Regions:
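Structural motif at the C-terminus of the N-lobe alphaC helix and the adjacent alphaC-beta4 loop
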Residues: 40-50, 103
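Conserved kinase catalytic-core helix
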Residues: 79-115
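Short, flexible helix/strand-to-coil boundary loops that buttress conserved ligand/catalytic motifs
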Residues: 26, 45, 82
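ATP-binding glycine-rich loop module of kinase domains
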Residues: 7-35
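Conserved N-terminal boundary motif of the eukaryotic protein kinase catalytic domain
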Residues: 1-5
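Conserved short submotifs of the Hanks-type protein kinase catalytic core
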Residues: 63-77
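Short beta-strand micro-motifs within the conserved protein kinase catalytic domain, predominantly
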Residues: 54-66
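An alpha-helical support segment within catalytic cores of ATP-dependent transferases
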Residues: 105-135
């Protein structure tokens, strides 16, 4: 079965390949970021209770681009559902809120804290002087 393009942006393309989804990163995409994404997914998988596609492989494609292969989960996006059933918009939004609440109720001690990540990224910004970085 040939890969079917599902989604594409400036840094990656996602393909369906049978019962797998393959995210292929563009040439030059940092290896550390690819491996970190896979590690975060594996850690979230390990806590259980959140239906995320399992990581099956992290590899280098024939063209030298990194890829992450996951199980493909059949279904429609929230946008597709809302377009097909506009009368159920509130119901879908409530389901999304419940999902977010459930996700945030989980503890995954091995994940980096978002606050720390944001502080690090802000401190690395040369465009901001130290006074604005502090604010």
């Amino acid at each position: 079965m040939a890969r079917e393009l599902i989604s594409k942006n400036a840094t990656k393309s996602v393909y369906r390949d049978g019962d797998k989804a393959v995210k292929v990163f563009c040439k030059g995409f940092p290896k550390a970021e690819v491996l970190n994404e896979a590690l975060i997914s594996a850690r979230v998988e390990a806590i259980g209770g959140i239906n995320i596609p399992s990581i099956q492989a992290v590899s280098v494609e024939e063209d030298g681009c990194w890829s992450i292969t996951r199980d493909y989960i059949e279904g429609k996006t929230l946008t597709e559902l809302m377009k097909e059933n506009p009368d159920k918009r509130d119901e879908y939004l409530n389901q999304m809120v419940e999902l977010q609440l459930m996700i945030h109720s989980k503890t995954c001690p091995l994940l980096n804290k978002l606050k720390d990540k944001m502080a690090r990224q802000i401190s690395e910004m040369e465009e901001l002087d130290s006074v604005n970085r502090y604010d």
